[in-house]
UniProtKB/Swiss-Prot annotation:
Topological domains annotated Lumenal: 1-11, 76-93, 154-162
Similarity annotation: Belongs to the V-ATPase proteolipid subunit family.
Quaternary structure and interacting proteins, as annotated: V-ATPase is a heteromultimeric enzyme composed of a peripheral catalytic V1 complex (components A to H) attached to an integral membrane V0 proton pore complex (components: a, c, c', c'', d, e, f and VOA1). The decameric c-ring forms the proton-conducting pore, and is composed of eight proteolipid subunits c, one subunit c' and one subunit c''.
Species assigned in the record: Schizosaccharomyces pombe (strain 972 / ATCC 24843)
Main location: membrane
The protein, known as: V-type proton ATPase subunit c'
Length: 162
């Protein structure tokens, strides 16, 4: 049933939130993986013994994609063709998806840049490893902030249509 508070198009915004969460977070994860992978490939030719330690940025980039998956599944779980879906919920889900997705892009970019340069520096100087991991953790937390905000937003939905 369509009303002013629950128009027929309100689910579009919810689905846009699902899409934004997945697309942007995976874009960030893919970029971070590609950049860090390029550095690992360059290092592996000179010091193959440090390749396994150098995989940390790639793993951390992959976690950014998982944040987007979690948010997308939660948003999609709130949507059903059998139940009313308010415009308020649509906007909340869109903002939650954008919060997770866009912080995922920022975190993925930061992880990729730090991972690429950090791994190359680690090849030359072993003491760099701890500093690189600390900076990677701070970059990963950017994506985690978005997930936390998205989860808080997602709990505020309301499908009251009267």
């Amino acid at each position: 049933m369509s009303s002013n508070l629950c128009p027929i198009y309100s689910s579009f915004f919810g689905f846009a939130g699902v899409c934004a969460s997945m697309v942007f977070s995976c874009l960030g994860a893919g970029y971070g993986t590609a950049l860090a992978g390029r550095g690992i490939a360059a290092v592996g030719a000179f010091r193959p013994e440090i390749v396994m330690k150098s995989l940390i940025p790639v793993v951390m980039s992959g976690i950014i994609g998982v944040y987007g998956l979690v948010m997308s599944v939660l948003i999609a779980g709130d949507m059903s063709p059998d139940n009313d879906y308010s415009l308020f919920s649509g906007f909340i889900h869109l903002s939650a998806g954008l919060a997770v997705g866009l912080t995922g892009v920022a975190a993925g970019y930061a992880i990729g840049v730090v991972g690429d340069r950090g791994v190359q520096s680690f090849m030359r100087q072993d003491r760099i490893f701890v500093s690189m991991v600390l900076i990677l953790i701070f970059a990963e937390v950017l994506g985690l902030y978005g997930l936390i905000v998205g989860l808080i937003l997602q709990t505020k939905t309301s499908n009251v249509c009267y």
